[in-house]
Amino acid sequence: ASINYRYLSIETPLPTSHHDARRALQFMRSKAKEWNLDKSRVAAFGGSAGAQICMWLAYSDDMAKPKSKDPIERESTRLTCVATTGGQTTNQTEFWKEMITDLMGPKIEAEGFVRPLGHLVDPEKVRMATWGAKTLEQANKKAARHSALSLISKDDPPIFMSYGMPPTAKPPADKGRARGWLIHHVNLGIALKKKTDALKLEAHLKYPGAELKYPSQVEFFVDKLSD
């Protein structure tokens, strides 16, 4: 199944899209009998922002509300496994600043890659509006609560991550292309792989030149979801 979620805007700040995805997952589980689904074997896949949302679902504790009057909210949000492409494993400003400096050089300011949001152009105001926060501190706390690197724990499911460049790739000269290159960079996956290895969790990181057990997320899903 595929889902739609509301995109980021001033009217629908994060984590609106995350909550839409959570609701969709619980809705599908609520239809398990009608649709002949095995609700004990559920995986998620997404790219870029969708990848970020999938990791949030995978690494969050179960958000089911067993006593809710809404039967959909009673359903589990836990996943059997997850696969991502070009996923942002963190929303933490300091991580991004450090990564951009490492990849682009000390003369390039991370703030220069911040896109306007609605009528807002100032990076700090954009960040607060992105998370529906009144202060940067509030925004940063919300960001941490929706970042895979902050959430992951030893009881979380396997992941298969894909990125389009090797760690040694050089950044594009064009700034517009460089932004897309940065926000989907393999270093984001490497950071999460270090965390999964430390927690002894199963994680597969695909990029050009990497040697892997699974050629793609398809084989990964088949293995994890089959009897």
Name the predicted role of every residue range.
Residues S2-K39, H185, L212:
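Catalytic nucleophile-loop/oxyanion-hole region of alpha/beta-hydrolase
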Residues R6-I10, S48-Q52, Q88-N91, P166-A169, ...:
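Solvent-exposed loop/turn segments at secondary-structure junctions
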Residues L14, W56-L57, T93-E98, P171-D174, ...:
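Short, solvent-exposed loop/turn and secondary-structure capping segments
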Residues T16, D20-R23, F27, Q52, ...:
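Extracytoplasmic/secreted proteins, especially bacterial periplasmic and envelope-associated proteins
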Residues R23-M104:
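Primarily recognizes the serine-hydrolase "nucleophile elbow" in alpha/beta-hydrolase
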Residues D61-M63, T93-S153, P157, W181-H184, ...:
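Mobile cap/lid helix-loop segments that gate and shape the active-site cleft of serine hydrolases
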Residues E75-T80, S153-I159, L199-L201:
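Short, proline-enriched alpha-helix->beta-strand connector loops that line the catalytic pocket
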Residues I159-A169, A173-D227:
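C-terminal catalytic histidine-bearing segment of alpha/beta-hydrolase fold enzymes
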